[in-house]
Amino acid sequence: MKTTKEWWDKVSKSEDEMVNWLRDQYHGEITAAKRIADSKTNYNISKLEEKLIDSITKDEYRHAKLVKQLLISRNIKPEILTKEERYWNKVLPNVLEENTFTYFCAVGHLAETMRLDRIQLLASDKRFKDIAEVFMSIYPDELFHARAFKEMSTDEDIEKAKKFHNIGMNAIGLLP
């Protein structure tokens, strides 16, 4: 297992790993947008929650577009991958078992918070100006998403979700 910095040091030194990571980012933004949008039909939510979910979904699709442009500028074909979802395979079964919107939001809060560390690191790395610019523009949205999901959840659900979040982080090789 490694820290975000150790992960980025490894990825940023290998063209193949960088390409794979960028493809994963595009895939992740698209699938996140779909997963979040689906929550509107999977749960009985208030108008305010629906408005927040719509806003987050719109942001995730915008992030996907930014990453897609980044891929194209690097002559990499943007595509939705068929791949093992190492983190989500550990986390989503419990979301289905709990089957509440507040638990779904607890998981969203933890996932978005996890991404904030990575995004801050990427946005500050001036070796890759194009990547830094994309992630600087994404950062405020992700900060909002983490806060919004926390507001739509409960402390109890966040505590329950941490167990599976940590298992998911372990599956992707990050320290919880």
Predicted regions and their residues:
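Non-heme di-metal
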Residues: 1-176
